[in-house]
Amino acid sequence: APSEPHHPGDQATQDQLAQYYSDLYQYITFVTRPRF
């Protein structure tokens, strides 16, 4: 399972934030999807 991404912090660049939110979205999708 993917690990929860860490927020890059207040000094993060837009690219770092975009990558973080992309990773976070994938993480949440993985964690919350039903297990059949």
Swiss-Prot record:
A Pfam family the protein falls into: Hormone_3
UniProt modified residues of type Phenylalanine amide: 36
GO molecular function: hormone activity
GO cellular component: extracellular region
Main location class: secreted
InterPro entries: Pancreatic_hormone-like, Pancreatic_hormone-like_CS
Keywords: Amidation, Hormone, Secreted
Subcellular location: Secreted
CDD domains, alphabetized: PAH
Primary role: Hormone secreted by pancreatic cells that acts as a regulator of pancreatic and gastrointestinal functions.
Family: Belongs to the NPY family.
Name listed for the protein in its UniProt record: Pancreatic polypeptide
Taxonomic lineage from the root: Eukaryota, Metazoa, Chordata, Craniata, Vertebrata
